[in-house]
Every structure is written in structure tokens, then in C-alpha cells.
């Protein structure tokens, strides 16, 4: 932050920010984009909520609705058309939805037009009804890029899937021959695959069903004759028949039929020419003959004999025969007639409703086969007859498409055409001849991202298709009685599909909210799993591996360690997703060795075959590459190339990795595997009691904190008006002439109030709390940090603490990555964190009567109820422990259903305690803490005077707000119009309000701005002679009307809430929530880690006096095992340790960006500057004996994190508890309060020791001998000897299984 010396800038937390030394040598040319742009842009492009109706583009929801309509009935009497859609404002705030367990959503309303006529033949529609219809509610994205669904904050993860288009691949047959295939993958519709085989033929597979020859498909689409097909591939040769060429003809194949006009004899095409046939042709009077071209090794062009081979093996000779073959192979039965077979083929590939390549699919095919299309069109231009046939087929395809759509065809055709099929065959022929390359399926040009908007669009397509079917059924069953669009539409159809997607889809995830970095990474994640994607079991090594096209697009480091490795990735810092779904990364253009300032966003396809260099290449003062040959990158190679050949340069050293990996200082000195762990473990760091930013950072800390939306930023320049722990008020500067709108955003002329989040529970039970950084009267600039969150310090991400570390073994306690801590870290709450747990109790109306929250619980002591209020809910501030009552609740007993008379008597005389049972909610085992918040929601409608009074108060409140808004508007209008000349203003009744050429003064403005006339004035025509003023007046009026509408909507919403009561999930009458805060200090068993993958478990907490100490008597805070460094190859932690020590001594912080940070020499210089040894080692003394250790020890300050793997959540013990219903064995796991599994190998161990009694106990009374364990319990309680064990229940289960197989098993108790 820049400080102006003329003004006072004081921060609440720290009056003098710590100076920061930046080690970066290369400055990034452009700043990284907003890290949440991926989510926000995708969603808002889908719904286009801020775009005026007339300017909405054909994308997202608009496109889906346009494609779903019009809907007609089978008789052609009704036509339901789509006009536009709109949204209402969300009914509840984000906080309300989280507290009440509701969905943060908006209602979708669609304007539809229903037309009707008496007879299908009538040209004009008789009458039309236009109506706005409610189509359901859509979850709405919050400004943080998340969705609130049933009270839970969720994220929709982007999916990386195979791009639609054409993909060429190869496979090797066991005999060693290469086979090639081409797969055309549409967005919607049947897949078609062309495949060569070992017999040199091309087959076609549709939806991986039975195959048929490609020539049959070409015939079926219109190229009926052999000659037509051969002509497409230039395989027809006209040979003059002379005695010299007679020998050449023998052995060749006829390309067309030869007819002897005198005898009527026919020699059909595909016949091999013999001497007799040559004589026959000459006798028939032919001077020349058309034959199939033959290929020898001397031919210049590609060998196309594969087409000839395919034709020779084709059983069809006409279009009709080919159609029959195609139909039979795909439908497994004969076609009823040729028209049915033809319409089936047309429906499969040429019907836009059934087959859709999509914009991306068409773009990919056009890009991939551009040369083949050129060759094909160039060749057809020289073949008039063939071109005429091809044009006829094309017209036919266009006509087929047109018959399914009322709109004229424009732009790209999104169905297959015959040109596509022929071009694919052209490319296959090139592949067979080794003149083309197969595609790499893992190349990012062949994989695209489906963001949240596209996934929602797909759900709407499904929902609207179901709705369309229902509408058609309703229209077909209707007679000519009047119906409106609202009678046809069932809103539940669409909203149920969308709700199901958010609740159950693999890509809709419960947000990881451990800290701001975890939250942001979750939103930038790209998954190859999910519907239509890969599965863990099927995915091989290649698809998981890092590909050269990932450079600058997907992070090569950040990915999970388990079975999902490589399938889930993170977008790189600079990566963006273009409108076609391909990931782009920025590059600077290099021309003739000179680096320009032009920055282009390139997809993997754009970058292919280009030469790029890293940003670290030396440049001279003219921005020319200073060395003749540079090590560049092209595809997956790193050749030395002349500087003039370079096309692009990176924009930043950070662009290769994701935000989490970019937070690791000295990443370049860490092994990739450990860097992966470091990136992943930062996401697991719990926010601590006091946040502390790292001494050694990378410069990305501020970017992550800001873009995660965890800090509050100033929206403009202004002065802080008020600061408390609950809110911050900033009065922004307003430019009277230009900034018209800002004055209406708040009634207080530019005053904006920011409510601070205080002790909010996250999804992972961590604590989110904001605190102000500014003071009253402070001047702030746009982008300044106004408030920190629980994981930031002065606007920088702060996930851990800087602690003094020594790398040395200590009495074996830090063996195998164990960590030794000083007690100081416990006493001073250095690694103490706050965890907030939410407990929920609800009241339902059961069959036996309604449950009830109460503190009047039968048979419970007054002491146990001491902390409950009159509603039976624990008071705020109460310290609670295991088994304490949080919410008192009684529920009716289930002996019998009460009769109406009994219900009446109980209502009059009160309930007997014997009729209810205690169903109170208690604090679970192993938990203690302080109640920090309680909430009670009731569905019951408020009654009596109470509600009337509240509505009156509400009306007065909103009347005042409206009056205040109008007053502000009029004041602002006067400011704009004062002294300007009028153009003549009339009311809607025609009354002259302001004469033409009149100057606006106080008297004129008083008449003009009279409130009754205000809404009737037409401001569009302009009110002054100045266009600029008119524009500002229009903006002001528009904003005023919007604000007024919002105010009235808000008034109606609040009245609705008062009248109806709290909205709760179905079936729940009352809902109580209790929030308990726990303060957890660091303890033995907690997991800790640095940022370099150096993780470990706290093994020992030593008294401060026992810790190793320096010569000046200062003890270290933490002791790490030095053996954890060399084999893990994460040397970055040693650089960080030494530089952190220097920073602590000098009182400065360091910024060392990855691949662009401090060198070994610079670290040494900083140590020397601080008066510390340049090698970072000093002599330490044993805290127990006071003696000096033999060797010097590396010490310094390292940034350590406390991870959310706390021992309190993991340690667990059970004596008795729940049992499995069938086997009667104890359940497993802490969540089920289960026992420890005594498995097969443990049994072997006891067998090996011969411990027969213990073994018998383990397998019977301690497990599933139901009678035996009850008797054992009684014996222990009574102090008697233990009984003999009985039969384990699992043995009985085995007996029943065998009896189920028909084997009679009897247990013989007799001992022989």
C-alpha cells in the first residue's frame, strides 16, 4: 500500500507495516487475472442477469430456451413460443439461507406466447395469449463463486473432458500391421468411427455397433454409383483402347458398366478385365474405357488402393441396397421400406434435434481438416458432373435440417455433411500412406473444460426436454377450450433436475473451507472425473501424466496424492478459459528476436509448433534477445534455436504453476513430489488465534487473500467514517458531474457500510472472523485493505507462524519425522486455533402429536437444566461439557395414537408427563466448549396484535426509506439541472410543466420535481439541450426506478416473512441451532507441516528450560530431524530457515517469487547483514545439561502450519456401544462409536503365542456372542467369575447362509 505523507495512515493492528525486500529480478508484464473469474464469468455468462433483454447473446440459458421452443401439438393447432426470461431478487440473504438450511436461489420467470387456430391448414393463428410463467427456482451464485444448497455452501467444479470434433488414432494388430481410425464425436448424438483393417479396407462403426464398409455409407448418402465414389478420390482413369495399350488393360477393374447396345450384354463395374472382355468392349464399339486407377511404388500421389479394395468387397451396388445394409446393421432388423431406411439415416446425422456437433465440434473439424476440405473443393471444381451431384446432396442435407427448424440456416452447420465424411476418409488415406499424424488424446487441444455455466445448461436441456414432452401431451389431450401458457407448464419439472444436479452430481462438491486458500483452490479445480468423463479404475498412466500443453494452463505440481492423482488438477495462475472451453495462457509476441509489449492469450492449439522462450532470457535495452542462440520450447522438446526464430515469450515465471504452488518460497529447490505435498497441505492449515504472515513469502500472499474475497477492500477513494468490531463505514468521494449512480447506492451520499463477519463457522468447523485495519478519519484509496480475516495479516495470507527451528536429533524424540515443540508455543497460544461446532435440533409434527422445545423435562434435575432458557435452549456464554443438555425437547410416546377427544382433553388440562419422553440434544462425547450463538426458527405464523404492530412498524420504516430515497433523488436531479436550459417538459396529461428554453432555477425545479408528476415524465426525449446532462439524468432516473423497485420488493418480502413465519425445510416446524466454540492448543499427536512438504506429528512438548538454546540464552521453539531433509530433497526449507532468521533479526520481510527469487549468495548476504554466520549454523547448548553440543546446528525461522488433522478428532476409545444388526459385531470407526477391529492377522498372533483363553474371549464375549457378553457384563458388575462363552452370532449367520443353499446344518453340543 502506498502512503501519502501529507495524510495520517494508521492501522489498528500495526501502525508501521514491516518493510519488505523484493528479490524478484523479472517483473511480470501483466497482472494475473481475478482467480475467481473462472466461476463468476461462467455463471453470469450463462444467466446474463445484468444484460438488458434486447442485448442478450445466444448463449447459456437464452440458447437453451430458444432451442426448447417453439412447442407444437401433433395436430398443428397450438404453438407455444418463447419470448424472454427474467429473474426476481433472492428471497433471503446468504447468511439467512445458511442458518435456516435453505437454498440461496432466484425464481426464473419466462414470457411465453401461446397461439391457437381451428384448423391446421389455416395460414394465420386465430388468437394469441402472452403470459409470464414461473419456471422454478435456480440456485444463484454468491459473489464468492459458491452456491448455498440446503444451507450448505457448495462449489461446482469444472470438468476436463474430450472435446467434440474428430480424433484420429492408431492401433497395432497382433500381426504387426498398423490400423488407423477416425472418430467423429458430437456434443449430442451418435458417434461415428471409420476404421481401417488388416485387409486394407475401411469400415464404419456407428455407436460402436456392427460395422459395414464405408462405401455403403457413401452410397446411402447419395453417391450411388461406383464411378461417383471413385471419382471423389480421383480413382477413375480413361484409357484409350489401342493395340499397344491392350495388354495394359488386362488385370485392371472396370469403373463403370459397359453395355453392348446391339446385344444388350452388360459387363458390370468392378469386373476384372481379361482378354475376352477387351475384345467384347472393342466389339461393342467403345474407343475408350473408364477403369479404376492402379497403384505402383512409382506413383507420386498417395496410394488410394484402400478405396478400391473397399469397393471390390462391397455387397451393395445401389443407393437402395446401401440404405438397407446400414439400417439392418444398426437396427438388427430389416427396413420396412426404403423411405424408412432413408429417414432413419437422416434422423441419425442430419436432424439438429438429434445430432449436434456444437460450435466447438464444428470448429475442431474445420480446423483439423482444413487442407482436406481445400483439396476436395479444388478437385470438385474441375469435375462438373461430380460437383453437381455433390451440390445436390448438400442441398438435400440443408433441406433436411430446414424441415426441423423454423429459423433460416446461418453460420456453421452443426450437423454432419457429406463433405465431413469425405474429408475424414481423405485424412485416413494420408495416415495409411504416412503423410499425416495421428492425434494425441491427452493434448489440451483435444480436451476442453465444461465450466459451471455449461454444466447448468446441460441440466436445463434435460429439464426442458421433459417439460416439452409434458406440454405436448397436455396440448394433444386438449379440445378447443381456452388455455393459457401457465396451464401447460409444471415448474417442478425443470427445478427438480437442477436441484438433483446440485445435490447429487459428482462435480457439485461440499466446499473445502478450511482456510481461504482451500476455498479458492476448490473453485479453480479441474476434474477429469464425473458424468461423461473418466473413472479412477479406467484411467491409465498417460492421461494422468503431465503433458507439455499443460505449460501455463494446468499446474504440474498441485494434484491429489491418492487414486485421483493426475485426474484432478488446478488451473495455473494466469490461465483463463475461452468461450469454446479451451484453456488459454498469455504470451508476449516476439518479432525478429525483439520482444514486444503485445500480449496474446493462446490455447494449446494456437501454441502448437510455435517456439517459446522463458521470461528469464536476457534482453538488451531495445528489448531484443541479447544472445544469438536460446534454449527454447517447442512441443515437448527444448532445442537451441536462433533468436530470430522465437515466436513467443512467457509473461511471468509464476505462470507455470497454480496459486497454491506459487505460495511456496524457493520452490525451485524442492523435489516435485514434496512440492506437491506442500501445495496440498497449505490447504489443510487451520486458521490460528492470531494470524501471522510469513517472513519469507513469494508475493502471491496478497493476491490470494484478495481474490479469495476473505478481506474487505475499499471500492474507491474516500474517508473512513466509523469503525467498530461489527462494521466499517466509508464515505466515498463523489464527482458531482460524472459519478451519478454512486450517490443512489446508499441514501447517505456515498456512505457504504461493510458488515464484518464475526466468529462464523466454516464448512470444516474452523473459525472465520474479520477485524478492522483502519481507524476513523483515515483516508483510503481504491483497493486498500479495510479488514483482515482470521487467515490474513495486513491483507496477506497468513496460515501459520514463524517459529525458531533447529535441525538436530534430540534424544530420539524426533525420530521418523516426529516434531519436538517448546512449551512456549502452548503457553503463548502460538498454535492455538478456534473451532466452532454446530448442533441442530428440530421439532416435527409426528403421528403421535407434536414435539416440543421446553426446559420442563420430566425426571431431569434442576442442575442439569440450569443453563436452559424458557424455550429450552442453552444460554449464550454457558460453558458446556460432555452429556450436558443443549436443547431440551420432549416427544410424544408411541403407545397408541391419541383420539381427537384425547387431543382436546390434553390441550385443555395439559399433557401428562408419562405421555412424553425426553428427546433432548446433549453435548457429544469428548467435547467441551463455550456456547457462542443460538438460533431459534419457527414455522408457526405469528398471531394477534404482535404481528399487526410489527407490520405497522415495518410499513413506517419503508415509507421513510422511500421518502428519503425520493428526497435524495430530487436533490441530485436539482444538482444536475440547475442553470441548464429546458427543451419543454409535459406531463402525461399534456400539461406543460416547464416551458421550452426556460432556465432551470429553484422555482422551475420545484414545479418540475413535484413527486406526483415524477413517474409520468418521459425522460428518454431529454430534459435539457445538453446531451451529456440528458445522459446523466437518464442514468439517475434508471437507477432511482431500480432502487425504488428493489425497496418495494424488499418491503413485500419482509411482510411475507412476518405473515408466514420462518421458512424451514419440509416437515420441520421449529429449528434450534447451537454453536459451541472450542479453543484447541497444540498437543502431542497433532499434525504440523512446513510449506515444502516437510510434515510430521508432534511427538514431544518439552519445558522451555529443556529446549536447546543459543549462546545468548534464547531457546528454540521447534526441533526437526535433519534426516528428514536429504532423502526428501526439499532443500527449500533450509533456504527459508536461514533467510527467515535474517529477516527476524533485521525486522524485515522478504518476497522471493518462485523461479525468480533470492539466490544462495543473496541469502548469505542477508545473513551477514544481520550479523549472523553466512552458513546459517551456530553452536547450541543442551537445555538439560547446559553443555554445548558437539557440532554446529542449522537454525533459523521457518513458517510452520498446524493442519486440520487434530488428535482430538482422531483419538477414540470404546467399552460398549452399538452393534451391527446382522452379525452383532461392534461397528467400526469413531463416527459410529465403534471398536477396534481384531482381524485375521491378529488372530494368528494370539495363535502363535498359544493364548487360547484370550483368543476365545476376543472371538466371543468381546465380539458377537450376544448372550455371553450380557452375562459377562453382569458378572463384572457383581464381581463374579466370568461365564463360559457361547456361540458367536456370525457363526449363526454362516449356518443360515448354508441352509439357504439347501444344506442342513445342526450343531451337536455333545462332547465325544
From Swiss-Prot:
Keywords: DNA-directed RNA polymerase, Nucleotidyltransferase, Transcription, Transferase. One of its GO terms (molecular function) is DNA binding. Its EC number is 2.7.7.6. The keyword Transmembrane helix does not apply. It is an enzyme of class 2 (transferase). CDD domains: RNA_pol_B_RPB2. It catalyses: RNA(n) + a ribonucleoside 5'-triphosphate = RNA(n+1) + diphosphate. GO terms for cellular component: DNA-directed RNA polymerase complex. GO terms for biological process: DNA-templated transcription. DNA-dependent RNA polymerase catalyzes the transcription of DNA into RNA using the four ribonucleoside triphosphates as substrates. The RNAP catalytic core consists of 2 alpha, 1 beta, 1 beta' and 1 omega subunit. When a sigma factor is associated with the core the holoenzyme is formed, which can initiate transcription. NCBIfam families: PRK00405.1, rpoB. Belongs to the RNA polymerase beta chain family. PANTHER family: DNA-DIRECTED RNA POLYMERASE I SUBUNIT 2 (PTHR20856). This is DNA-directed RNA polymerase subunit beta. The gene is rpoB.
